[in-house]
A protein has these predicted regions:
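Short amphipathic alpha-helix adjacent to the substrate-entry channel of hydrolases
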Residues: 266-282
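Alpha-helix-centered segments that form part of catalytic cores
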Residues: 231-232, 242-247, 367-378, 431-443
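Bacterial N-terminal signal peptides
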Residues: 1-8
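C-terminal subdomain of alpha/beta-hydrolase-fold enzymes, centered on the catalytic histidine
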Residues: 405, 411-480
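A Trp-anchored, charged/polar loop motif used as the substrate-binding/catalytic surface
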Residues: 234-239, 262, 305-312, 357-368, ...
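Serine-dependent carboxylesterase/thioesterase catalytic core
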Residues: 27, 31-37, 41-44, 53-68, ...
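Surface-exposed acidic, glycine-flexible loop patches that form ligand/cofactor-binding
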Residues: 242-245, 274-278, 310-315, 367-373, ...
């Protein structure tokens, strides 16, 4: 019964009963939770609880209950020290005394092999306090140490940081040698073991909580508004890293499709993080953009963001792009070279007319002429309409085009450049092409991209509605 209670949760209200060998440790932990006490007194009580429980780790009689106490004490101590006294108790040697207890606490220095520098993060949240309702399968390992979501949020925000900051899984381990104690913040994606009570032990880790920490909204509504109210959502455009940059890992960049948001990828990323080899080799990024914009304009913005990554992090090589639906077309535009002559596939006379007013370097030129990114090593396309979708020219597509409101400055720039030649793309000399136009099988963009080779190894995941793995199959939107 005791083991069952210990396993149930590490939340404050689910501690093991205060009895038996660990009675004193539970008492220390409950006292440490009293926020009315001075910070130093609370820290000492967390250390008391961790020290007493660590002495029983692995014992047959009380080992599991002691593990729960030790883990919670380690996690909550980190949260306290990082937030107390405006960071005054963080990442410096501390001598802490209360009653008959005295501890000399030091922070382990960060290394490049799985030990975080304490100053890397601005706050912490215990992993068990994060709401995981949007995660289909929790990815965690039961072991030793306090599992935490670490957050790095600066003001102003650093490049490629989400609004809530960059998160990462961290496991806090306290190793006692008499009254001397070392606090280590371990990256469980790099290390599977940490030293506690004089022994290397399997780390407790939660890889799902850092993903679930990011705010969850109504995805369908947010995606729809991003498609039809483009101007109001232009500021979200960008690449975002979901963990601190690691030059040893390959950027795996996810690009969502029409009427969607980067949140669509959370369970895909969670499954990737489940595999020890994948999480060791890859770091996941997402590209966000309002999906109503012209397809080639969104592709340009992705291209510009990738260039910023390369400028800030020159070690970002061998990147892998994963695009769903229209996001696959944006991804393809990063691994394909399109030059002026490429547009002759729609007819030389039409192409000449369209480019007659286009000047090198202007917006339209940058959207329609580009080279494959040499730092992208592979592309994965998921249900991507490389040759367009008939749905874009049907009733639903026509209605969607009418609902989309594009940014005024973007419309003005394009109109002033190509003028009446816009009809070549939209059929209307006065109408700017939307993303829906870009998905039409009749659209010149689709024809041009389809005529240019993909310059990296690539893979396609193709949907099927039961017609078999044949050229006649379809997922209902995109034909084989």
């Amino acid at each position: 019964m005791l083991v069952g209670l210990a396993l149930s949760s590490c939340a404050p209200s689910h501690l093991p009963p205060g009895e038996g060998l660990h009675k004193s440790a539970v008492s220390h932990l409950r006292e440490a939770e009293k926020t009315t006490l001075p910070d130093e007194q609370r820290a000492v009580r967390y250390l008391d609880a961790a020290r007493e429980s660590s002495a029983l780790l692995g014992s047959a009689e009380s080992g599991e209950a002691s593990r729960v106490i030790y883990n919670k004490a380690a996690a909550d101590l980190v949260v306290l020290l990082r937030s107390a006294q405006n960071g005054g108790m963080w990442n410096r040697p501390l001598t802490l005394s209360q009653g008959g207890s005295t501890y000399r606490l030091r922070f382990a220095k960060g290394t490049r092999d799985g030990l975080w520098n304490a100053d890397q993060f601005t706050s912490f949240v215990p992993a068990d306090e994060v709401d995981l309702k949007t995660i289909k399968r929790r990815n965690r390992i039961d072991g030793y140490g306090g599992a935490l979501v670490s957050i790095r949020k600066t003001d102003p925000l650093e490049a490629f940081s989400p609004l809530v900051g960059v998160t990462a899984p961290v496991t806090a381990v306290l190793d006692f040698k008499g009254n001397d104690v070392t606090l280590s913040l371990i990256d469980p994606t790099e290390r599977t073991k940490g030293r506690a009570a004089g022994k290397d032990r399997t780390l407790d880790a939660d890889f799902s909580a850092p993903l679930a920490y990011y705010p969850q909204h109504n995805e369908m509504l947010e995606g729809l508004l991003g498609a039809i109210r483009v101007q109001q959502h232009m500021n979200i455009t960008g690449l975002y890293m979901l963990q601190p940059y690691d030059p040893q890992r390959i950027p795996l960049i996810f690009v969502h499709g029409l009427i969607s948001t980067p949140r669509m990828w959370r369970n895909v990323i969670n499954e990737i993080e489940t595999d020890p080899e994948l999480r060791r080799r890859y770091q996941c990024w997402v590209f966000a953009y309002p999906t109503g914009n012209p397809l080639l304009y969104s592709a340009l913005r992705l291209r510009e963001e990738l260039a910023k990554v390369q400028q800030r992090y020159p070690d970002s090589k061998d990147m892998v792009l994963v695009g769903h639906s229209m996001g696959g077309i944006l991804s393809r535009a990063q691994v394909t070279t399109v030059e002026r002559d490429s547009w002759d596939v729609i007819g030389e006379e039409k192409a000449d007319q369209f480019f007659s007013k286009v000047k090198p370097g202007d917006l339209v030129h940058r959207c329609t002429n580009f080279t494959a990114n040499p730092n992208v090593d592979r592309a994965i396309f998921i249900c991507s309409p490389h040759r367009g979708s008939d749905m874009a020219i049907g009733t639903l597509g026509s209605l969607a085009i009418k609902l989309i409101s594009l940014p005024v400055d973007l419309v003005s720039t394009a109109a002033n450049t190509v003028g009446g030649s816009m009809s070549m793309i939209t059929g209307d000399a006065k109408r700017m092409p939307t993303s829906i136009d870009g998905l039409s099988p009749k659209n010149p963009t689709v024809k041009v991209l389809d005529s240019c080779p993909i310059e990296v190894p690539h893979h396609s995941i193709i949907g099927d509605q039961g017609k078999g793995d044949t050229p006649e199959s379809s997922d209902g939107v995109v034909d084989y």
